[in-house]
Amino acid sequence: MKKLIVATLLLGSGTLLSAQKTAKIPAYYKPAKSEMYHKDWIDFNKNGIKDIYEDPAATLDARIENLLQQMTLEEKTCQMVTLYGYKRVLKDALPTPEWKQMLWKDGIGAIDEHLNGFQQWGLPPSDNENVWPASRHAWALNEIQRFFVEDTRLGIPVDFTNEGIRGVESYKATNFPTQLGLGHTWNRELIRQVGLITGREARMLGYTNVYAPILDVGRDQRWGLSLI
């Protein structure tokens, strides 16, 4: 967990999808707390001092220990939580003033499948304006990231996760066969290309962590996902 937290902290700081329609992206606003941003470091905890965990020149282990020493139990707990995104659990597409009173006021480990265009099972696709085009989607995720960096105490960036077992789990992304179908091709190069496309589309949409297919044989009949 220790290395995952700081890896997220570090990472936080050819188009393959169908043709995008031209859409006006909201004006990129100046950071609300511009004094945080320095030439070679970011004052994540807003104390005006370059703490060890904020120093890119410090060793990874030193940064991890320094950050953990500053974290409360609530902040550590929240870094172990994944929050399902818009229309699943999260009700808001973008940050609102109420977020400063919600569970994730202390940060959150990950937000999964946020603004991917899907709602609860059986419901039609979301018509939220931030789902598409991809440039608008990436902008929206950046605005959410800004909340976690600028408006939480330690400024730990959130990880934007998504499924990648048969393409990115996004309404506009390329859909591939399930793991079982891909496995039946016995074509390693084809599977490599599927992974390449999935990665490029996820990156374009702004997702930072994509779950890969299980590279193993499912032998336990109690595990229903082995048939997916």
Task: For every predicted segment, state its role.
Residues M1-K21:
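Bacterial Sec-dependent N-terminal signal peptides
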